[in-house]
Design a protein with these regions (language model features):
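Positively charged, lysine/arginine-rich intrinsically disordered segments
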Residues: 5-7, 18-21
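Active-site-adjacent bridging/hinge elements
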Residues: 142-155, 173-188, 328-330, 360-365, ...
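Glycine- and acidic
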Residues: 154-164, 187-195, 304-309, 334-341, ...
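Nucleic-acid-interacting cores, centered on viral/eukaryotic replication and modification enzymes
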Residues: 313, 318, 329, 358, ...
Length: 968
């Protein structure tokens, strides 16, 4: 049974008192006092460097909406001007005034407006990636420069497949490719990069290029032996790593030719063309009878039997795109070799070494070893520096391979390593400013510093580059590697005009994507004070959130939390428990200024937690060994905090997360170790589900923000445990007695502190499925009102014996998207008989909280909910003793809406406090008494834009009060 107790409330610096209870009502993360800029920081007459972020995004509340709207309008005006007055201004118009007056034109225009308005309404239920509440996938708000660049170029609809179809945006893509290569540490003149629709395409292309490079020496050897046109190069020599010296290519064994180093192979076409005097196209025409990509896999394998089991090596955490790559390229899914990961979900270099030993012994060629620079689930960066060392040592043994870095997620973190160019408009900062930023851990720094030694790198501007889809990219250390794709045999695009359709998988692709990335790069900058600043502030948020999850459970809770990446076993001789104490004492609840001054705490933050912004965790019950129960709890958390295709609107999801599962791998101890930490049975191979909380939010830097996330997550965990473990029961909902024109009625749950099934505070809207039943209900309610001004309320009791969660959110056992209720006058007893039974649909659940306090609040708190016709207050119970109460207000209080939507907050539901009433109930004869002695009270609440509001509530009718039922 879950006992009533308090939620973890952090101390606000300097406040000295506990925060008021929050849960998922009107969170303080939007209080106006939480300014991004402190007054003292702006008083110097210049912005600190971190203030630039304010101009890079529209803002979670569209704070830069006016600026964005103005720039979009100017962008559209510029395009209209181009069409009208710049491009052949003497051309006559087609859409004339007469045409616009035609009925068909007007009908089409009206249809356009109607459908667009419908689309706009539908899109408002989309996932709110831009919100500080969003902690799900590796996706967040789009940088304003990127959005504006996309919109500007979109109007011109350029196709970057061919230069003549995209004269401007092709050059943009070339510029972007170069900039990304430089950010990754490649030499500007030797490297190349280009955009693709996403990381999947980039990864496939990288393996495609690596495979073709791997097999090229075999084809060339055969051609040198057979082709008269290549006779002048018959004695062509290459360096054989295993021999440690030069030798004739024609004299190399098949195994030796499959293990030449990449740079030697990339030089072969140029060398042979120089020795033979052939043009590149002529040489490739000769080679077409020998290349894998020309003659096909069966014939090439017949000629070169060793290639039959050629494989690609990836960590077990690798993206599914590599499975697609080996399938599409004909290598076969069975030849995708997965390396086990360690307890930090990083590729285990010891296991990789064993695999390399086995492949060397069995003479199985390896096309490439893939290092993931930031998994999007576990947030881990593979030990690239060790992988590079292994290649160096195994090359000398006769086993060589390309190395591809999948930096789709983590690639942009290299911006944190790059200094700001002196020509940039922002001067280098004198100090770090008000908002702290956490740079890369020593381990991550080492790995990202080594990516410039990889042959290819995938990087996605539409992930950590905050650009719109589709915008992935692939960078080549040596631009010559791209020509081995052999898409065209006639042109080598080393510089000058490039037909981008000839350098990758894709043909048509939007020039708008290139414009978006280019403008973002130019405005923000691919350096420490551009993207590096954004990501370092996000890193600060991620480390704090990691600390929050580590310390969220309290000693007397019945649940534990384990992060997928554990705390260090030791840090400066501190045990894990001592580290948790350090987190609680010196990190959680501290202001940005306090943390920035605590060098040891900041050093600790830098080294712990996720490699790349994604803290993950699993919740389990104490003493629970069942993986199924653990997974069910975490699935319930995910379902509560995620969007679905159902009817639940976006504002009913107080925080958005996602989830995945840690899977078994025969050579990995990661799952077993994770199960041990969770107290689960680790003898089987069943996967364990975990919650993913991605931190791509540079705004999340206030104490209040983390308090609110803690409250939301804690309530979600308790409700999820209840979903799985609550004993089944019938549930009573007290009616407000008011049915609107659409047959909807608001109800209040009759919770109980002592009954594990009913330890909830809940308000919901139900809808009668039948007009007849709604009419019968209203007639009964009217009859009751005629007998008394405060009659017993009508109570809906669920007929199904189930959990409260399943009544409100589960699939109906009746199969008609509704629940069945019996209707009683007053709370039913064992002797009560229902006066009718109804089928009702649960339309809205604005409040669903598990009791979790051991102290009453300072002031009495109510949940205000309703619509423009009826407003109600529902008392929020906290701890025993307390009471249940419903009152109807005589009017909508001021401050709960806007001019366009006067009942906005009322429809959402908000917590209000009445300062004149103590949060502790008045006890008379051992029972709480009704505190509402007057008809009018002052009330406070968090209003629109986080402004603290004061209003007056006037009571029209007291519907229900009970100080007994909830306590016994």
């Amino acid at each position: 049974m879950l006992q009533s107790r308090k939620r973890p409330i952090q101390q606000v610096s300097g406040a000295g008192g506990k925060r008021r209870r929050m849960a998922n009502r009107a969170p303080n993360m939007y209080f106006q006092q939480n300014n991004m800029f402190a007054a003292k920081d702006l008083s110097h007459g210049r912005h600190k460097p971190w203030s630039a972020l304010g101009a890079w995004f529209m803002g979670p509340k569209a704070e830069n909406g006016d600026l964005f709207q103005d720039l979009v309008t100017k962008t559209i005006d510029s395009h209209i001007k181009f069409r009208r007055h710049i491009y052949f201004p003497c051309d006559p118009p087609y859409v004339t005034d007469d045409l616009r007056e035609a009925e068909a034109y007007q009908a089409s225009k009206d249809k356009l407006q109607t459908e667009l308005e419908l689309l706009q309404r539908q899109m408002q239920n989309s996932v709110p990636f831009y919100s500080t509440r969003y902690k799900g996938h590796v996706n967040w708000d789009i940088a304003m420069p990127a959005n504006l660049g996309y919109i500007c170029a979109l109007l011109y609809n350029q196709n970057n497949c061919a230069a003549e179809a995209s004269t401007v945006t092709t050059s943009f893509e070339l510029e972007v490719g170069t900039d990304l290569c430089v950010m990754m540490g490649y030499e500007k003149d030797k490297s190349m990069g280009h955009l693709v629709t996403g990381g999947t395409i980039a990864n496939i292309e990288a393996i495609w290029a690596a495979r073709n490079v791997k097999f090229f020496p075999l084809a060339l050897q055969r051609a040198l032996k057979k082709e008269e046109k290549l006779a002048a190069a018959k004695d062509y020599k290459v360096f054989f790593p295993r021999r440690g010296k030069m030798g004739e290519l024609t004299g190399g064994s098949e195994w030796e030719l499959l293990n030449l180093d990449t740079s030697s192979i990339l030089s072969m076409p140029d060398d042979i063309e120089m020795q033979t005097g052939l043009e590149h196209g002529e040489f490739m025409d000769v080679m077409s009878d020998y290349l894998y990509e020309s003659i096909g896999a069966p014939e090439f394998a017949r000629r070169h039997p060793l290639i039959e089991k050629t494989c690609v090596v990836v960590p077990s955490t690798a993206h599914i795109s590599f499975t697609k790559a080996v399938a599409v390229l004909g290598l076969g899914k069975n030849n995708l070799v997965k390396v086990a990961v360690d307890d930090d979900s990083r590729m285990n270099s010891g296991v990789l070494k064993d695999i390399l030993d086995k492949h060397l012994e069995d003479k199985i060629p390896i096309v490439a070893v893939v290092a993931v620079m930031g998994t999007t689930e576990e947030s881990s960066i593979d030990p690239l520096s060790e992988i590079l060392q292994l290649r160096k040592s195994y090359s000398k043994k006769g086993l060589d391979f390309a190395i591809h870095a999948d930096g789709a997620w983590g690639g942009y973190f290299c911006s944190m390593l790059r200094d700001q160019p002196q020509s940039h408009y922002l001067k280098p900062p004198e100090d770090s400013g008000f908002i702290p930023r956490i740079f890369l851990s020593n381990y991550v720094n080492e790995q990202l510093s080594a990516v410039n030694q990889c042959d290819t790198i995938t990087i996605d501007p539409h992930k950590s580059g905050f650009c719109p889809y589709p915008a992935g990219a692939l960078c080549y250390k040596d631009k010559r590697m791209n020509t081995f794709l052999q898409i065209t045999t006639n042109v080598v695009y080393y510089h000058g005009d490039m037909t981008l359709g000839d350098i990758g998988l894709e043909g048509s692709k939007p020039g708008a994507a290139a414009a978006a990335v280019r403008l973002a790069n130019r405005v923000i900058g691919l350096n420490k004070n551009g993207y590096g600043r954004i990501l370092s502030e996000c890193n600060y948020t991620a480390k704090l959130l990691y600390c929050l999850w580590v310390t969220l459970p309290e000693e007397d809770d019945n649940f534990i939390i384990e992060t997928t990446k554990p705390l260090p076993e030791k840090w400066k001789n501190l045990s894990q428990e001592e580290q948790k104490r350090l987190i609680k004492d010196r990190i959680i609840g501290k202001s940005n200024e306090e943390l920035a001054k605590d060098e040891e705490a900041m050093e600790y933050l830098k080294e712990i937690g996720p490699d790349t912004l994604v803290p993950c965790f699993t919740v389990n019950l104490k003493d629970n060994k069942s993986v199924d129960v653990c997974n069910a709890i975490n699935m319930a958390i995910f379902q509560k905090l995620s969007h679905s295709s159902g009817e639940r609107t976006a504002h009913r999801v107080p925080m958005v997360v996602t989830a995945s599962s840690m899977l078994h791998h025969k050579h990995s101890s990661a799952l077993k170790s994770f199960k041990k930490r969770l107290g689960l049975d680790h003898k089987d191979d069943n996967p364990v589900k975990f919650i993913i909380t991605t931190c791509m939010d540079p705004w999340a830097s206030s104490i209040e923000f983390f308090d609110d996330l803690a409250a939301i997550m804690r309530n979600t965990i308790l409700c999820a445990i209840g979903t799985v473990k609550d004993p089944k029961s019938n549930h009573d909902f007290i009616s407000t007695g008011v049915v609107d024109d659409e047959n909807r009625v608001i109800v209040y749950y009759a919770g109980n502190f002592s009954n594990a099934s009913k330890q909830y505070g809940t308000v919901a809207t139900l809808k009668f499925n039948s007009q007849k039943q709604a009419k019968e209900y209203k007639e009964k309610q009217d009859a009751l009102l005629k007998t008394s001004t405060e009659p017993q309320p009508i109570v809906f009791r669920s007929k199904a014996n189930t959990t409260l969660h399943d009544v409100l959110f589960g699939e109906s056992e009746y199969g008609d998207d509704s629940e069945k209720f019996d209707c009683f006058v007053g709370l039913p007893t064992d002797q009560s008989k229902p006066f009718m039974s109804v089928n009702m649909k649960v339309l809205d659940v604005p409040q669903f909280e598990h009791f979790d306090d051991e102290e009453h609040p300072e002031f009495s708190s109510f949940f205000m909910y309703g619509n423009e016709k009826s407003a109600f207050l529902f008392h929020i119970p906290t701890k025993k003793p307390d009471f249940l109460q419903i009152v109807q207000l005589d009017d909508i209080p001021k401050g709960v809406g806007t001019e366009d939507d006067p009942d906005l907050l009322l429809k959402h539901g908000i917590e209000v406090q009445i300062p004149d009433l103590s949060g502790s109930p008045t006890i008379i004869a051992g029972t709480p008494s009704d505190p509402l002695k007057k008809l009018k009270y002052h009330a406070t609440f968090v209003g629109i834009d986080g402004v603290e509001m004061k209003t007056t509530v006037k009571i029209d009718r007291k519907i229900y009060f009970d100080g007994t039922t909830i306590n016994y």
